Amino acid sequence: MPKQSFALFLLFSVLWMSCMQARDNDTVVTIGTFNMEWLGDGDSLDVKKRTEQDYKNIALVIEQTGADVLGIEEIENDAAIRRVLRYLPGYSFQLGSHGRAQNVGVLYKSTVSVRAGFEYMPVATRGDRNRPGYVVECSKGNFAWTMMVVHLKSTSRADSTPELRVASYANRREQVQALRWWMDSVSAISGKNAIITGDFNDFVQRAQNPTLTELINSSSVVFLTKELRSCRVPTWYGIDHVVANTAAASRWLSEGVQVIPIERLLPKEQAEMVSDHCPVVTVFSTK
């Protein structure tokens, strides 16, 4: 690592750890999302093959988020996330099983109470071609919330024709409609806090073929992360989001929303083995 880059890395680490220590108290809770890009269990069939050092680096990145609760995406199975948890004492997890090799779930510290969750199948609007959501009930201090973790349909290189791309947009819109129904049903309970976090595979500002419209147009939904930029391509808006209903958003501390830049924590070649996404976190008051 060049001397200048190493100096910047050290400066970032010191400042970030100071920020995390300030958050590590009972008056706030840090909630986020992290797509770990094909996190496998280490066998020969893994799509993205990682070394033990790579699993350690993933744990380092998670630790640096300071998250009390982290939505996690693209996890092959329980064994895969346990490879990371070896290096994260004090964390527990819950994981779905109907996302094939890309399951979603939640990672959380002992600082938070998290009840046993369940997969929310209505988000998988096209059966096993989609991933269901994962819902948990959480609380810390005087803040209790219902949270869903999602990984919506992507529009990728595999969608190689105009027809396939149009179909992917339609599929994601269906999923967003299911999220709107869920958010509305939770919000109908007076004072109930609801949060959706995960990889939405789209950004709020999209003008052509937008797919998040059903949530954006809701007067009871706030995209807390809509102004964040991609850590990989800074000119792009991010697709990893934390979304809250108005009750939960009233607890939001806007200065705490940020992307955790992996390439400032690790050399580039190591950062690339962690994920093609960076964690996104937000902070809420628990008072």
Predicted segments with their positions:
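Bacterial N-terminal signal peptides that target proteins for export
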Residues: 1-7
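Bacterial N-terminal signal peptides
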Residues: 7-16
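Metal-dependent phosphoester-hydrolase catalytic domains
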Residues: 19, 181-194, 201-287
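N-terminal, active-site-proximal structural segment of metallo-dependent hydrolase catalytic domains
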Residues: 19-88, 92, 98-101, 176-180, ...
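Catalytic metal-binding/acid-base residues of hydrolase active sites
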Residues: 37, 76, 151-153, 200-203
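Second-shell loop/turn segments in exported
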Residues: 43-49, 66-72, 94, 123-125, ...
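Structured beta-strand-rich core segments of catalytic domains in phosphoester-bond hydrolases
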Residues: 69, 74-153
